[in-house]
């Protein structure tokens, strides 16, 4: 199995040695002789400090020029002495073991400067470096994050201008990856929010990715899940986050082992342009003398970890099957109106787990029906939508097992003329022509015949379920069978099926649809496209059961009333801020008795739809919640996503109200889905002047005062306490029991790791660009966040003022796919 995860190193060397003359790093061993050659990439700066000095002098000259002799700023391209990566032997074609390069773009630039000339200088330097990288065949470049977040929009503007330049987007496109810590203790989603702001400014550009510096402390599960759905191209692993085991070898703590395994499991799905994920080690030379094995021990450990992860994933047959196919977004199938291809049937028939479950259901159903079967009055079994006959095969197997060959009559109905030919061949070769084949649409079968001439069936078996359960018209198709061909004791397999939705963040899904101009109002089937479910629960939206009507309560078949149209209002509570790109859909089905299949994610908490059955139950709320899992190793269905035309952002402790409708129109002869969204927050307000209320409702999230409190407070993960988040995953299971003796160095934050990657701890900022000595990355800047009006303090107000809970609407979407204008299913 190929995991698409590679290993890179940033060699330890002194940048100053390149400032006077060229000293190319033709191999890392010349600078780190302790390193073995078992790595795939070398991370090096594109240019040397010498180039920085040249550019600085050019900028000084530009600032000194007079108005009369003014000329636009011209930044020279780097010369031979100004580059770290040689213009030759970047990739030796005759030696696949030679590592490739990942480039570091200049980190001394101030892309967010308020001085337009400084920003212009930065952009021109980046374009020069990108031009050289393209020439020597480097396609992945890592960029330093902004230094001052109060000017983040200026930074994003320059990044987008860089991405829009032909030097970057011309095929094969370059990948620009912004380096950031995976999370901060004080605000775990702060770096994700930074990334999301820049990414949105750049309109989800496919060439923009993220490189994450692994933390030293355990990552909260909701933060990790958010990043797993993002286009992460590099994991930056500092030697400072390693511990030493009982043998003094460097090892990662178990939570970081699992973190890497989870990214390994994503398996390159997040790489839109096919760029593989790379784990980059850096700072190994700092602590080489403190561990056994020196620098090479770090590299050998990471390689061991990835190989172990490959074995774990390779042992999962379902994961192996998924790896055989590329990630893709597909329109839902319409088997009722379109004829499926032979290759589609073949793919579905490979899912032995599904057919094993069907076989078990058929066995139990025939055992229940057996007492009324005889040679004079054989049981009639209908396989509705037989396709190429896999369910007929399983039915014959059960009949032989129960010795009911003479007591059963089998009918297979299929409208696809090509599949019908296949059934004819199977009937002759395998079924001894004992199956009655009917080439017709099941919704029209014998509907014009007198009732006494219609075939009545005892068992109806079908596999008409789509990714959302009802989205391939199973209710409509089986209703025709029920109405015209069933009696009171007819058994249907499946007996019922439910549809479920949950709000998700899936930036790659949104990016792919946006870049290909595909409809954001139509539902899509997603295969191996990462997503993050934002709510704590998945909601059941509706359920269909068969039989759909009780015949013994109806005198005339024309009196049957069945609700094919369904609507559901769903409430979701979302604890952590984020952005919604749509709703993901799953289904579960009860085939017969206690035999179920499910496409819900493992360990899902499901809120069942409120029904009349629960109305009289005094403990109905408890009975509406249950745990569900995905049927192990079942591969027939991928999830369906109902997208939003515009992503919607929300803050911590938000509530969503989602309308999901299934519309069946006999007038227009089609079925379609419509959906929309509203978001809310709850505020706890004191009942005093409206001016104070209005002011308190506009306080930014990051400003917390004594006068403003939300109903549910933000809960931050803190490294200074031993508190663990309630919903945090315990990642310590199923990992080798390694005794860790402690960290190798003093505490190093994720931001320091990012600075180390870019060499910012060694070089000072040029004084001609900014004379103010401020931090490299100022995450605590709140210039733009200070409230303009000071609120009155509680001591100035009346005591014991009653509090009011206010539900405030924060956003609303349009109604999507109105009247089926983007997607519908013909009846």
From Swiss-Prot:
Phosphorylated in a cell cycle-dependent manner. Keywords: Cell cycle, Cell division, Methyltransferase, Mitosis, Phosphoprotein, S-adenosyl-L-methionine, Transferase. PROSITE patterns: SAM_MT_PRMT. It is an enzyme of class 2 (transferase). The active site is at residues 463, 472. The record marks 348 as: Critical for specifying symmetric addition of methyl groups. It catalyses: L-arginyl-[protein] + 2 S-adenosyl-L-methionine = N(omega),N(omega)'-dimethyl-L-arginyl-[protein] + 2 S-adenosyl-L-homocysteine + 2 H(+). Interacts with HSL1 and SWE1. Interacts with the amino-terminal regulatory domain of STE20. This is Protein arginine N-methyltransferase HSL7. The gene is HSL7.
